[in-house]
């Protein structure tokens, strides 16, 4: 049987590069704006510097060569990784040089982590608070100490070594970024080979990465943690490599190591259940997930992802073509299904980035919610300041990524979308139905907003009139979250039937016993009531409004009834003018601008809810079976009115930051004050128009001309878009700084 291999060979994946495509030239670095024909002419007005910052990374704004754009993005990724490695190296160096890590290891439940000691130049050493065991420094809330313990680091030398390793990796990343742009740059077809990319990312990054971490945990981290849990001093624990070369060290901790690989090859895997466990719940000694459960999880994940890395067809006869999967997705044959989407994601990096940002942002929010209910690192659950910081951090990261997804989806629609190539496919049909989608989503927002705020306004009114029996509360008119309670109940009750070998559910948050360390609550069942029901509908309202703004921006980014030729105006433009009133703030960029404010609204309420709820109903102490929470359970009684949120959360809990002056928390008081100023400063840009500032500038320039000190670069007021960008940046920076200082001063004081 003859086989024609000519076409098959054409389909083979080849790694193709251009050698020495772009010479290394440092002279261009000295010429700001060299990448743009207009900017390279130099500044005539002050607008030039703003345009320089706005456009410097807009690779496809000054080039239409997709291959060159792809190479620049690829190279920039290595640069980003290099910066991350330097940052991480700095964290580890601080841990080695300036921290109380070894003291913290000896008593992590009582001693607070610190890795920064402020120098006494003119009294700044007031910031060095007593974190325990005689160490004075700034308390940190990054969770790094807990990660280091979980990974088996026991001394400063190991931290130093890792810091040096981080710098070596940073150098390799910077070198790779230069090498793959200037010396051996991949061709476009390499960037567009989705199957190979997915296979390598699934098997390599996720599969082998998880396998490596599982191996590290089993052979090094868990044995060291077992010894620490038994009270062995960190200085007496064998060095990591000793567990690898001396088998008796491992056999003393895990007897199954004596049997070697025999149980593996004879499929008698249960023999390994001493280090690959399936216990569920939290370790009562450390308040974290069982490290042996985590190792088991990573081993299972590794197997799944290594298999998943063989799903997509490349040079071998197994797997599927992504294009065929997408084009085969025809539902009831009413449309072309997903045809055209493969071409979109392999030619528009904005479309691909949008999808990735939406997924990564959602994942970050999922991480935030898992990390407090299922704390992964030893003793992190009783470090309330770290728990609050990490929840807030992951929520913010998720919010910014999701807004970024909307931004890049809009850029794709404006710059990369071709209607002729997408006729009657999934995307086209969504665009055709955009009026129905947006109008219904708008109705949902109005419904949620009016009803959820209506409940609060009713309660505030009844409270003011002294009619507490007519309020929505757990003690009067109840609005119990029955569906949430049902989900909690089944997660707690059905463990015996769904996972008979597990001793506990995934988290005590579902129900069961309190997990406490030295009398301090790590996690316990979280009761939900009327106040939770009410604020959850505020969450639903703000999230839906954020989605409405971003989705409207995407679906109407090319055209609308108001501006049919919007795609010709680009991603960002102030108005469709001059001469057309009522067409301002309709660009896709403006939707991102507005979406950022609503994202801020959404997340502020989420992190406020989290902070108050856990202080009220979870965090605290257990003494002789008597549970005492930080705010003594006042969430249920107070969080059902707007006045309650203002009085018993914002005002009551801000006392620590307001009264922090003269203490080690005084920096938070100054940040609280300064961040309020930054936030207020933003309103100057958001409320006033460009003309006001241009008139003012011209008066100031007139005065300079009189004194013959007029600048060569003519001052110009910010454009409308630039003003909004500066405004939203300061609004968010001020808001985040205010919240950060408010949270930390409060939680460090009561932790």
From Swiss-Prot:
Which keywords appear in this protein's UniProt record, sorted alphabetically? 4Fe-4S, Chlorophyll, Chloroplast, Chromophore, Electron transport, Iron, Iron-sulfur, Magnesium, Membrane, Metal-binding, Oxidoreductase, Photosynthesis, Photosystem I, Plastid, Thylakoid, Transmembrane, Transmembrane helix, Transport
Under InterPro entries, the record lists:
PSI_PsaA, PSI_PsaA/B, PSI_PsaA/B_CS, PSI_PsaA/B_sf
Q: What class of enzyme is it?
A: oxidoreductase
One of its Pfam families is PsaA_PsaB
The GO annotation for biological process reads: photosynthesis
Q: Which residues bind chlorophyll a?
A: 684, 692
Localization of this protein: Plastid, Chloroplast thylakoid membrane
State if Transmembrane is listed as a keyword.
yes
Residues that, per the record, bind chlorophyll a': 676
Q: Which GO terms describe its molecular function?
A: 4 iron, 4 sulfur cluster binding; chlorophyll binding; electron transfer activity; magnesium ion binding; oxidoreductase activity
Output the PROSITE patterns linked to this UniProt entry.
PHOTOSYSTEM_I_PSAAB
The record's similarity note reads:
Belongs to the PsaA/PsaB family.
- How is the subunit organization of this protein annotated in UniProt? The PsaA/B heterodimer binds the P700 chlorophyll special pair and subsequent electron acceptors. PSI consists of a core antenna complex that captures photons, and an electron transfer chain that converts photonic excitation into a charge separation. The eukaryotic PSI reaction center is composed of at least 11 subunits.
Protein name, as recorded: Photosystem I P700 chlorophyll a apoprotein A1
Say which species the protein is native to. Bigelowiella natans (Pedinomonas minutissima)
């Amino acid at each position: 049987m003859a086989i024609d291999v000519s076409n098959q060979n054409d389909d083979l994946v080849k790694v193709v590069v251009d050698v020495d495509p772009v010479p290394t030239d440092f002279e261009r670095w000295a010429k700001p704006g060299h990448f743009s024909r207009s900017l390279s002419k130099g500044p005539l007005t002050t607008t030039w510097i703003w345009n320089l910052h706005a456009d410097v990374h807009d690779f496809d704004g000054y080039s239409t060569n997709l291959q060159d754009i792809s190479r620049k993005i690829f190279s920039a990724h290595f640069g980003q990784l290099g910066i991350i490695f330097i940052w991480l190296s700095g964290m580890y160096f601080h841990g080695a040089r300036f921290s109380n890590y070894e003291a913290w290891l000896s008593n992590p439940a009582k001693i607070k982590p610190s890795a920064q000691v402020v120098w006494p130049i003119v009294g700044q050493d007031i910031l060095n608070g007593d974190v325990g065991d005689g160490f004075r420094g700034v308390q940190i809330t990054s969770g790094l100490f807990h990660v280091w313990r979980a990974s088996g680091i026991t001394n400063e030398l190991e931290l130093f070594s890792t810091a040096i390793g981080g710098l070596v990796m940073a150098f390799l990343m910077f070198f790779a970024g230069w090498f793959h742009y200037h010396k051996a740059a991949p061709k476009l077809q390499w960037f567009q080979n989705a199957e190979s990319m997915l296979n390598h990312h699934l098997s390599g990054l996720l599969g082998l990465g998880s396998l490596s971490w599982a191996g590290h945990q089993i052979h090094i981290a868990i044995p060291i943690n077992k010894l620490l849990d038994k009270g062995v001093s960190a200085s007496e624990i064998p060095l990591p490599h000793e567990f690898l070369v001396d088998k008796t060290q491992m056999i003393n901790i895990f007897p199954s190591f004596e049997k070697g690989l025999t149980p593996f090859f004879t499929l008698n895997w249960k023999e390994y259940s001493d280090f690959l466990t399936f216990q569920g719940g939290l370790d009562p000694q450390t308040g974290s997930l069982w490290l042996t459960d985590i190792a088991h999880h990573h081993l299972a994940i590794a197997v799944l992802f290594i298999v998943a890395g063989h799903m997509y067809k490349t040079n071998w006869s197994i797997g599927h073509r992504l294009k065929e999967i997408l084009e085969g997705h025809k539902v009831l044959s009413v449309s072309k299904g997903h045809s055209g989407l493969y071409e979109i994601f392999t030619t528009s990096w904005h479309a691909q980035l949008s999808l990735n940002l939406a997924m990564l942002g959602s994942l970050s929010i999922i991480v935030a919610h898992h990390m407090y209910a299922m704390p992964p690192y030893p003793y992190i659950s009783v470090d309330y300041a770290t728990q609050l910081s990490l929840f807030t951090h992951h929520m913010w990261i998720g919010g910014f990524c999701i807004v970024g997804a909307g931004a890049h989806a809009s850029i794709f629609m404006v710059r990369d979308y071709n209607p002729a190539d997408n006729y009657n496919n999934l995307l086209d049909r969504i665009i055709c139905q955009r009026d129905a989608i947006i109008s219904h989503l708008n109705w949902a927002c109005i419904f949620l907003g009016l009803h959820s705020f209506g409940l609060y306004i009713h309660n505030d009114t009844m409270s003011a009139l002294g009619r507490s029996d007519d309020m929505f509360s757990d003690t009067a008119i109840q609005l119990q979250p029955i569906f949430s309670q049902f989900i909690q109940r089944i997660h707690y009750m059905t463990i015996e039937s769904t996972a008979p070998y597990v001793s506990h559910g995934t988290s005590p948050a579902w129900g069961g016993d309190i997990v406490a360390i030295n009398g301090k609550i790590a996690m316990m069942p979280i009761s939900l009531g009327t106040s939770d029901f009410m604020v959850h509908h505020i969450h639903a309202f703000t999230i839906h409004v954020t989605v409405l703004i971003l989705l409207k921006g995407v679906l109407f980014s090319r055209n609308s009834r108001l501006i049919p030729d919007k795609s010709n105006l680009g991603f960002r433009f102030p108005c469709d003018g001059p001469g057309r009133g009522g067409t301002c703030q309709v660009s896709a960029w403006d939707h991102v601008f507005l979406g950022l404010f609503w994202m801020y609204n959404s997340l502020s309420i989420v992190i406020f809810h989290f902070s108050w709820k856990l202080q009220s109903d979870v965090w605290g102490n257990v003494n002789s079976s008597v549970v005492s929470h930080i705010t003594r359970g006042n969430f249920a009684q107070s969080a059902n009115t707007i006045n309650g949120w203002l009085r018993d959360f914002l005002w009551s809990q801000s006392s620590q930051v307001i009264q922090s002056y003269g203490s080690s928390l005084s920096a938070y008081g100054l940040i609280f004050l300064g961040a309020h100023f930054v936030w207020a400063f933003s309103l100057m840009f958001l409320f006033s128009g460009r003309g006001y500032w241009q008139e003012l500038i011209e008066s100031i320039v007139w005065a300079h001309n009189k004194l013959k000190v007029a600048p060569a670069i003519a001052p110009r007021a910010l454009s409308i878009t630039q003003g909004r960008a500066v405004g939203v940046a300061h609004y968010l920076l001020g808001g985040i700084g205010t919240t950060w200082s408010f949270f930390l001063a409060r939680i460090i004081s009561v932790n």
